[in-house]
Amino acid sequence: MEILHIENLNFRYPKAEKDTLHNISLNIWQGDFTVICGATGCGKTTLLKLIKNELAPAGEKSGEILYNGKSIDSLNLRESACAIGFVGQNPDNQIVTDKVWHELSFGLENLGVPQNVIRRRVGEMASYFGIQDWFRKKTDELSGGQKQLLNLASVMVMQPKVLILDEPTSQLDPIAAADFIATLKKLNTEFGITVLLVEHRLEDVFPIADKVLLMENGCVLLYDSPRAVGKNLKKINPEHPMLK
């Protein structure tokens, strides 16, 4: 089942001379684990933020992005929070409270979810992510890996169907990064959540990806299985940096 449909998407930042995204068309299926890659400045982050409407940058946009057949522009805050979750690069930037337990409940409280439901969901996520031992800690006492895991758990407590992540391991050490990526795949497998991941540790994520989206200069260069992308990229450009 198609969960995200992107058709002829173009985007240009204010005062920019050319489009950052040009004629992007994609079909993303429910439960897919998709890795988005490409050189710095190719439009990866812009694409992710346009999918999460509250994070969309200012600029000129044309084309459409549909979630379950419905324009993301028509989703209200509650619908968007329960549909699409976002985790960014900096573990500190998404944390908004001073206690771990409050961070987990904050989004649900803002949506007016009943307290008994909040307690149940927070307890389930704390157990699933192994947060119980530091559940009552202050957030500024956590390591970078713990903070990013908390960010992920705080998003998952909203029960989104799509999870988009913009280089979430970029500030983590190799061990914490590997643990984080393994957790993403576990969520994808056990909950059937659709994952769109921008990640520079390609050797860690290609083996677990269903699809790879390779972008170049704001366009889709290739979109297929990891094996097919590698094979076709060798034909298109044997000297491409991704092949080295």
Name what the model sees in each region.
Residues 116-134:
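Conserved ABC ATPase "signature" region
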Residues 1-6, 11-23, 55-58, 76:
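A short, flexible loop at the N-terminus of ABC-type nucleotide-binding domains that lies
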Residues 138-142:
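Conserved ABC ATPase signature
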